[in-house]
Every structure is written in structure tokens, then in C-alpha cells.
């Protein structure tokens, strides 16, 4: 069932793929659990900033307790409210981090408020309403794709064939 829903959303996304007003790089995964997305997001932000680009990050803010969206995360934000990963990104990079479960809305806020040259989405691969210029999927090099099955039978959020459609696959920890 999860696999069918993922395929349906992906097909609809392909048909209606909107172009983002600025380059949007989505860093995500197709498995449940941690794969190292956030460290990669931090490294990408730092590399872009070092090249003189103005960067913003959008995120859902998984694990936070806030219900006030959109919300900007700063180095001083409370991780219990907004999630530990957005706070870590803000602390390590100093760039604006905008939280909203509706990542398209977070993107709109980031563009309107900060005029970035590049927006990086921490997660959001399956959030097809978010326009994107490129997709990077992070795979845990030790766990791989598990048994290769989609939820609830396995660890995949989408079929493994999705890896053929993304721009880059990064293997971590293996």
C-alpha cells in the first residue's frame, strides 16, 4: 500500500513538476531511520557559503513540539520545540532555517524573507509539492535497503527503483 501511494505521488509530481524560483536541492532518503542526511546538509551549506552563495534551509522539524508554522530556527532555538536537527544546522551553518510541515510554504518564506541563491531541503524527498532542481538520496552504507520492501514489510518509504530517478546517491557509514 505504501509503495502504491509513493508511486502515485511520484507520477503526479512528474506530470506537474513546477520549476522552483531559485535552485532547490532536496536531500532525503528512501528508508526509515537515520542515514546521515543532516551532516550532508551541513556540509553542502558550508561548501555553498564558502563559494559566496547565500543559502537557506527548509525542514519539517521532526521531533519538535511546536505547532506554530512557519518558524525560523536560530542557534538559540529550543530543540524540544523545533527539533534537534534544525538547531544543529542553524548552529553549524549560521544560515536561515525555516520549519514548516508544508515545505512549499517554508520555501516561499525563505525566498521572500532571505532572497537566497540556493535553498537546501533537509528531508522532503517524498514531499512532492516542494519544487526541486536536484535530489540527493542518502543511503546507510551498512544497512543498505534492508530487505528491499516498502513499509510495513520493510524499511523503504518508496520502491528501490526510485534511486534510478534521483540526481545523486550518497552512501554513508559503510
Show where each model-derived region lies:
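Walker A (P-loop) phosphate-binding motif
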Residues: 10-75
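Phosphate/Mg2+-binding loops and adjacent switch elements
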Residues: 61-174
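N-terminal, well-ordered alpha-helical segments
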Residues: 2-3, 25, 42-46, 87, ...
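Short hydrophobic helices that act as membrane-entry/anchoring signals
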Residues: 2-10
Amino acid at each position: 500500500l505504501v509503495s502504491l501511494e509513493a508511486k502515485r505521488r511520484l507520477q503526479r509530481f512528474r506530470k506537474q513538476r513546477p520549476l522552483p524560483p531559485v535552485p532547490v536541492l532536496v536531500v532525503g532518503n528512501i528508508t526509515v531511520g537515520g542515514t546521515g542526511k543532516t551532516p550532508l546538509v551541513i556540509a553542502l551549506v558550508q561548501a555553498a557559503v564558502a563559494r559566496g552563495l547565500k543559502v537557506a534551509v527548509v525542514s519539517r522539524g521532526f521531533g519538535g513540539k511546536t505547532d506554530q508554522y512557519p518558524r525560523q530556527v536560530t542557534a538559540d532555538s529550543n530543540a524540544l520545540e523545533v527539533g534537534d536537527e534544525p538547531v544543529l544546522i542553524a548552529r553549524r551553518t549560521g544560515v536561515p532555517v525555516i520549519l514548516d510541515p508544508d515545505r512549499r510554504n517554508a520555501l516561499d518564506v525563505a525566498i521572500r524573507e532571505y532572497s537566497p541563491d540556493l535553498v537546501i531541503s533537509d528531508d522532503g524527498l517524498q514531499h512532492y509539492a516542494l519544487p526541486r532542481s536536484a535530489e540527493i538520496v542518502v543511503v546507510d552504507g551498512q544497512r543498505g535497503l534492508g530487505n528491499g520492501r516498502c513499509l510495513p514489510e520493510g524499511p523503504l518509504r518508496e520502491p528501490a527503483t526510485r534511486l534510478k530517478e534521483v540526481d545523486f546517491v550518497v552512501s554513508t557509514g559503510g
